[in-house]
C-alpha cells in the first residue's frame, strides 16, 4: 500500500547525542553499516527510548503542534489484539523503561519524518561530529533492498531459525520465532551485513510509503524481502529504520 505522506516543519534544537539519541555523538562504525558510497543504514530499528527523547525535545521547545502530530497512539494495541492480551502493552509499551529497547510502533509516517529531521539537525550542529554535513532519512524501497542484497541469512523471520518441519507441515504462525509481540532490538542474529531485524519484528516505513520486511504478526512467507505489507498507520506492527547519507565530509 502506498501511503500519502504529509510533512510538518519543525524547529529542532541541539542537545547531546545518544543511541541514535542524546547522550553521545553517533559512532558511524558502531551504529551504522555502509550500504553504498556515502549511504549508511542503522543497525537496528528506532527504539522507544530514542523516539521518546525526540518527543521530549519537542515539548521542551514548546512545539505543541508537532508533538501532537508525532505522538504515538497506544490504543492501536487494543485494536489489533484482544483486550486481555494487549491492555498491559497499551498502558506501558511506550513509557515503561522495560520496553526502552523495543522498536517504536503506533506512529505515523509524519512522526518518522519528524524524527529524521530532528536527528539531522542535532548531528549537523554537534561540534564533535565526524562528518561536516549529513542527512538522516527514510530509505527508498530500492535502498532498503540494498540493505539485504546477497543476504544469505535473510530467509528466517527475525533472523531466527524456525524449524523447517513446522513450515513444511503448514503450522508456522507468528509466535514460531519466539516472540508473541515485538521483541527488543538486536535480540536475534544480524544478517551478514551486521543489520538486525530486517525480516520480522516490525515492518519498516520507506520513503515512498511502502512497508517492508514483515512484522511479528506475519507468517514467514509474508515477510519475504520482495513483498510489501499493507497496513494503515499508525499500527503496532509498523516502525522504521533511519539511513544516513553523507552530504559533505
PLM ranges: what are they?
Residues 5-7, 207, 248:
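Intrinsically disordered, low-complexity segments enriched in glycine/proline and serine/threonine
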